[in-house]
Amino acid sequence: MTTPPRGTAAPPTGDALEAPGPLLMLLETRAPWEAAAMVAASPWLARLPRGDGHPVVVFPGLGASDITTLPLRRFLRRRGYSPYAWNLGFNLGPRPGVLDNCRSLVQQAAHRHGERVSLIGWSLGGIYAREIAKEQPQHARCVITLGTPFAGHPRATNAWRFYQKVSGQVMHDEAMLEQLRMAPACPTTSIYSRSDGVVAWPCSLNPDAAHTENVEIQASHLGMGMNPLALYAIADRLAQDPASWRRFDIHGARRWFYKVPVRAPRPVVAAAA
């Protein structure tokens, strides 16, 4: 196993990886404060570099709809990008037709703008973003996920029962889980929080590769898409030229807000209960 960077601890694996406990779940009540912080941070966020107008498709989390990603999409539009909602109502899992519609949306955005598309996914939406980028590498500019559990067993989250109920799917196929762990070929960023009350944070760690990274912030799972630190990192990542992509720089004042990145040396898997 690769030694983790100095100042970090290796993430728990196997039986040690469990869903967040009651205290972290209680901390999810801070989400409204993160929305308020987004408003308060507007002058700071307005100083970020303008975007180049390229299309950005945003996928909502499990049980959520485009309403939850509206603040993020408004932020992206103000920064000069061309954001797209997924327009499929509530995200109740990859039920029949859902992924086909997502694929079509990305293709249409790419053709309309004549350039590749950045894909942003919150929680389960990040799974869609990653998988579509793998299927359509010719259309994917970059992938950014927010609290997405792509690297661990579904039972290392507090949403797995709800997922099974609304989607009608049981995720115990090891081949499928292995597929989810693989990063897309394009630059791929995972924004995660150790205080996430829904997803065990090691489930959101990209394995170490030249085109992957993990950016740690202090955020709730439910408020991550409105958290000013997440928005800042998203804008920074979208402004990167894929041809000369570099990992998120946490030198200077950023060290006060972002943690030393952790890169998983190997896929993180929890034993099924």
Please give the residue ranges for each predicted region.
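Hydrophobic alpha-helical segments, principally membrane-spanning helices and signal/leader peptides
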Residues: T13, L45-A46, V106, I132, ...
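Helical cap/lid subdomain of alpha/beta-hydrolase-fold lipid enzymes
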Residues: K134-A273
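Generic preference for well-ordered secondary structure
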Residues: A9, T13-A16, P20, A40-A46, ...
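Flexible, membrane-associating and regulatory peripheral segments of lipid-active enzymes
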Residues: M1-V56, T69, R74, R79, ...
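Serine-dependent carboxylesterase/thioesterase catalytic core
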Residues: H54-I67, P71, F75-C186, I191, ...
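Phosphate-binding glycine-rich loops and adjacent basic patches that engage nucleotide phosphates
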Residues: R30-V39, P60-T69, T189-A200
